[in-house]
Regions:
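Detector for outer-membrane/organellar transmembrane beta-barrel domains
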Residues: 127-193
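Residue-level detector of alpha-helical recognition elements and their boundaries
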Residues: 29, 41, 82-84, 97, ...
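Outer-membrane beta-barrel translocator domains and adjoining extracellular loop/strand segments
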Residues: 4-11, 38-43, 92-100, 146-156, ...
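Outer membrane beta-barrel
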Residues: 1-90, 117-122, 126-134
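Transmembrane beta-barrel outer-membrane domains
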Residues: 4-9, 58-62, 114-118, 153-160, ...
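Loop-centered beta-sheet repeat module
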Residues: 99-148
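Sequence/structural signature of outer-membrane beta-barrel proteins
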Residues: 2-3, 33, 51, 87-91, ...
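Glycine-rich loops and low-complexity Gly/Arg-rich segments
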Residues: 19, 49-53, 93-96, 108-110, ...
Length: 193
């Protein structure tokens, strides 16, 4: 600890159980996108490094401050999550944070000193009705955050749609995910920064 200046907390939230199928959550939580961000411990993916999509597009470990609901609908075999989060930070102290070579990774706020100029919406549905199969559909929509909202070009729009599937049968395990990320207002942002 002699050279440590900060300590990061991965998750810290309160969860209130409304009933058997619904919870309200608030605090520092993982953004529900894809497979690896929610299940990111090294023993849960095959390889030394995280997949490229989970390093730059879904910048695991991606956690933000938020509030929302989670639960399940047993008769439909669905698990759901819906949250309002602070978004990626794109501009602070008079300079841009995001660069194309890093994807969205450097914009993660991780809870510490987070700026919220407009909340972002994130949700995920998981279907678990077939033994061994889990299929997920996730979405993330909003704008990046800035510490100076008077500079209009300091934010960009972020829209992500994700589809993931996992299947396990005996010793066979198959996984796949597809993430479509769209950024808007990038030309104005690049001109500014």
């Amino acid at each position: 600890y002699e050279h440590v200046q900060e300590v990061y907390v991965e998750q810290a939230y309160l969860k209130y159980k409304l009933n058997e199928n619904a919870n309200v959550l608030a605090g520092l939580m993982l953004v529900p996108m894809g497979i690896i961000n929610e299940y990111h411990e090294p023993t849960t993916f095959y390889g030394v490094e995280r997949p490229n999509v989970d390093a730059a597009i879904v910048p695991t470990t991606w956690r933000e401050l938020g509030v929302g609901i989670s639960g399940k609908i047993d008769n439909a075999s669905l698990k759901y999550q819906a949250y309002l989060f602070n978004g990626f930070k794109s501009y602070a102290g008079g300079s841009g944070i995001l660069r194309g070579s890093d994807g969205l990774r450097k914009g993660r706020q991780k809870g510490a000193e987070s700026v919220v100029s407009s909340p972002n919406f994130s949700s995920k549905l998981d279907y678990y009705g077939i033994p061994g199969l889990r299929v997920g559909l996730s979405g993330y929509f909003g704008k990046t955050q800035t510490d100076d909202s008077s500079i209009e070009a300091s934010t960009i729009g972020v829209a992500m749609i994700g589809f993931d599937a996992r299947y396990k049968y005996n010793n066979l395990e198959l996984r796949g995910q597809y993430i479509n990320a769209n950024l808007s207002d990038t030309e104005d942002y690049n001109t500014l920064t």
